[in-house]
Amino acid sequence: MPIGNLGHNPNVRALIPPAPPLPSQTDGAGGARNQLINSNGPMGSRLLFTPIRNSVADAADSRASDIPGLPTNPLRFAASEVSLHGALEVLHDKGGLDTLNSAIGSSLFRVETRDDGSHVAIGQKNGLETTVVLSEQEFSSLQSLDPEGKNKFVFTGGRGGAGHAMVTVASDIAEARQRIIDKLEPKDTKETKEPGDPNSGEGKIIEIHTSTSTSSLRADPKLWLSLGTIAAGLIGMAATGIAQAVALTPEPDDPITTDPDAAANTAEAAAKDQLTKEAFQNPDNQKVNIDENGNAIPSGELKDDVVAQIAEQAKAAGEQARQEAIESNSQAQQKYDEQHAKREQEMSLSSGVGYGISGALILGGGIGAGVTAALHRKNQPAEQTITTRTVVDNQPTNNASAQGNTDTSGPEESPASRRNSNASLASNGSDTSSTGTVENPYADVGMPRNDSLARISEEPIYDEVAADPNYSVIQHFSGNSPVTGRLVGTPGQGIQSTYALLASSGGLRLGMGGLTGGGESAVSTANAAPTPGPARFV
């Protein structure tokens, strides 16, 4: 493959003579045969520039590349490390971002520009900050991913192989994470996604969400009904007391009575004095004394008959006063008794109705609240949510070529086993992270084949969330050899054709990935333009 060396190799400190060109059978960039090979690294590993497409002199209107997000012509180069394994050439990205990814793992980092014009990427892990200097190609690639200029990115794991760290914008990974959470949250609904074109690789997804939960005691309407009944009873008692104090007949005063004997004596004495006074005014009512000369002189004493008459009239007046006193006392007592009886009747009626009903309401509300609380304590089940998700994958007939999973030395996986491996059971998840923290839901997707079998249930969820964006294909190879190659591109387009061609020509070997081969039709296949949003993974 025609290459251009970066000029240094951080893995080799000793001076090494220039290496000869790599075998011509691995030349996958046939359109760049006129480029010179300059290398001062070892034969097994060296840093280089690799042309992404057929030639760097492609037409200016060709905006697609095998790696979404890289700038268009003439900057379509990737800083890589090439390793020779037998007759197969395997490429790895090597640069500041790889150094930073090795230090901080799959986490957030930011890009800053220093005063001297250099660009640095800064990440943090376990309280330690790591800073690396970015090359112009790396900085341009990151700029193409971040048109908004937020300069915050996330390593999303080795999606294309253990040696290649994928990068996306932090806001995009947060959006993708939220979409995954939304997919996992139960909504007590049944969703069915019918399969699309049988040859498109789309699957039939059936989701059944069953949520069983018991509301808290405070959310039970029966409790609030009981409390409202108690409140109504208390209000009724207060209203009854106010009505008895204001609206009912007032309590009568004690009756005013007069002693009949005292009234008779008083009246008799008064009448006697009055009659005696009137009798003295008439001289005929007085006794007469005859003096020496024979003249009649009043003696100043009333005659006996007049005195008797006065006494009789005074006695009659006293008796009349006695009767009047007795009658007055009787009327006063009768009035008191009537008013008191009326008040007692009103009090009895109001107390029986007002306090009785209010007391019954309070008692009923208290019993209802107690029973409701007891039932909640007795019948409170553990809140549980069951989410059943069945994925039936309709594999196309040419699945090996479309997915790029051809294994030239291992047994072919049957469609039935692939469908069975895609059936999964997922339970709901909760989001307790703050908005300032970006968690990476794709951090564990770049795992070996044997580890992926235990967690195969997670991949359909991620693939469903990113059904339409440009995701890189995950390459899993059998055997004990480590996965050292990388594969980047858009599923279903040029990159799969490349792998199909390499598999048929023997360029793809067991346990190794990479872009190798000897045809021009594969590498010249145009891919779709990068999709904006959380799909931009490189």
Swiss-Prot record:
Glycoprotein as a keyword of this entry, yes or no, is: no
Region Disordered, as annotated, extends over 1-37, 184-204, 279-299, 313-347, 380-449
- Give yes or no: UniProt keyword Nucleotide-binding: no
Q: Provide the transmembrane region boundaries.
A: 223-243, 355-375
* Effect of inactivating the gene: In a rabbit ligated ileal loop model, mutants do not induce formation of A/E lesions.
On modification after translation, the UniProt record reads: Phosphorylated by host kinases.
Q: State where composition is biased (Basic and acidic residues).
A: 184-196, 335-346
In this chain, composition skew of type Polar residues spans 381-411
| One of the Pfam families matching this protein, by short name | Tir_receptor_M
Q: How does it sit in the membrane?
A: Multi-pass membrane protein
Where, per UniProt, does this protein localize?
Secreted; Host cell membrane
Q: Which domain of life is it from?
A: Bacteria
Q: Which residues lie on this side of the membrane: Cytoplasmic?
A: 1-222, 376-538
Entries under InterPro entries matching the protein: Tir_central_sf, Transloc_intimin_rcpt, Transloc_intimin_rcpt_C, Transloc_intimin_rcpt_cen_dom, Transloc_intimin_rcpt_N
For bias kind Low complexity, which ranges apply? Answer: 417-430
GO cellular component term, pick one: host cell plasma membrane
- Which keywords belong to this entry? Host cell membrane, Host membrane, Membrane, Phosphoprotein, Receptor, Secreted, Transmembrane, Transmembrane helix, Virulence
Where is the motif (Essential for actin pedestal formation)? 440-442
**Which ranges sit in the Extracellular compartment?**
244-354
Record's family?
Belongs to the Tir receptor family.
Q: What does this protein do?
A: Multifunctional protein that is required for efficient pedestal formation in host epithelial cells during infection. The extracellular region acts as a receptor for bacterial intimin, allowing the bacterium to attach tightly to the host-cell surface. Simultaneously, the intracellular region initiates a signaling cascade in the host cell, which leads to actin polymerization and formation of actin pedestals at the sites of bacterial adhesion.
Record's subunit section:
Interacts with intimin and host proteins.
Identification of the protein by name: Translocated intimin receptor Tir
Gene encoding this polypeptide?
tir
